[in-house]
Amino acid sequence: MIISAASDYRAAAQRILPPFLFHYMDGGAYSEYTLRRNVEDLSEVALRQRILKNMSDLSLETTLFNEKLSMPVALAPVGLCGMYARRGEVQAAKAADAHGIPFTLSTVSVCPIEEVAPAIKRPMWFQLYVLRDRGFMRNALERAKAAGCSTLVFTVDMPTPGARYRDAHSGMSGPNAAMRRYLQAVTHPQWAWDVGLNGRPHDLGNISAYLGKPTGLEDYIGWLGNNFDPSISWKDLEWIRDFWDGPMVIKGILDPEDARDAVRFGADGIVVSNHGGRQLDGVLSSARALPAIADAVKGDIAILADSGIRNGLDVVRMIALGADTVLLGRAFLYALATAGQAGVANLLNLIEKEMKVAMTLTGAKSISEITQDSLVQELSKAPAAALAPMAKGNAA
């Protein structure tokens, strides 16, 4: 298959992966309305073409948390990367490192912190969930610090897991799930050889190091399901702020008031995110939520954004809507599943080229010059208008 655009990796990954894995990464919560709107709303943001601007000295470089980035992109924390390619977290981290951008290791990674961190030169970021077992959280933070992780990404939009109906149909969960997964694996030989046989151990490395090695995937799912904490509040985060002395980013912000609370709390950054449409279906897409949040806290805190970003044009759109940097999730996972480290490296090259074209044709020589002026104003203002209170006479 010819890979000429980032979108080509999705089709390639679907051919290679057993259905339970493809649909686990590709699916969302409930009817997947927000999952679809993430992509569609962002694609409808119109760029403003400008010409004859002498763009010969264009630069994508930026700085975030005192780290130099080759472009305003980081790889998002994505669970189970090691089930999509052999030791997948290591391969993705190496690709990000070679491109000069951060890699974020998920709490629920297959490869543990101690395996991934030594494989790259720049410090990686680490993502942590709020869990009832504070002992695990402290253990994970201590290990992340010992491994030299520079930035903590704290995911707060998962006090309880979202209902992902696709998983029951695909075999990730539901009746006879283990047998269905086995049958799918043996009928996908490329994956079975690369990951099924040669990518072991298939456990959640950061958790097994704390609990010991559970007997199967269901044991991890059960432990995690029992440990998500719906009682969490800002007060519960204070001990983490005291314990972690590096940059701390709050992931899962969709409301301007929550963004202001993050500033008051003392966070260094936020991620405008709906968890890729995997938590609460029907919430705003990140593209629609971002402008109002930027209006509220831009300049007071670093603003990152994810959900729906599939190519370099989308990166430019998110920056113009108010983000300082974006996180890539599904986009890099499709590439990882298709061709491992080389796939992610090629994806990042494609995104960089697409960004350069978009910046050249919108007249933005640097990341700081990508602003609302880079957008067609009537359309770029539309997402923020979605947050305005509905007039009583227009209620439906």
UniProtKB/Swiss-Prot annotation:
Positions of the catalytic residues: H275 (proton acceptor)
KW Cell inner membrane (keyword) present: yes
Positions of the FMN hydroxy acid dehydrogenase domain: 1-380
Record-linked InterPro entries: Aldolase_TIM, Alpha-hydoxy_acid_DH_FMN, FMN-dep_DH, FMN_HAD, FMN_hydac_DH_AS, LldD
Protein family (similarity comment): Belongs to the FMN-dependent alpha-hydroxy acid dehydrogenase family.
GO molecular function: FMN binding; L-lactate dehydrogenase activity
Cofactor(s) the protein needs: FMN
PANTHER family: L-LACTATE DEHYDROGENASE, S -2-HYDROXY-ACID OXIDASE-RELATED
Enzyme Commission number(s) of this protein: 1.1.-.-
Binding site for substrate: Y24, Y129, R164, R278
GO biological process, one term: aerobic respiration
Protein name stated in the entry: L-lactate dehydrogenase
Function noted in UniProt: Catalyzes the conversion of L-lactate to pyruvate. Is coupled to the respiratory chain.
Residues engaged in binding FMN: 106, 127, 155, 251, 306-330
Membrane topology value: Peripheral membrane protein
Subcellular location: Cell inner membrane
One GO term describing the cellular component: plasma membrane
Protein keywords: Cell inner membrane, Cell membrane, Flavoprotein, FMN, Membrane, Oxidoreductase
Catalysed reaction, written as an equation: (S)-lactate + A = pyruvate + AH2
Claim: Cell membrane is one of the keywords in the record: yes
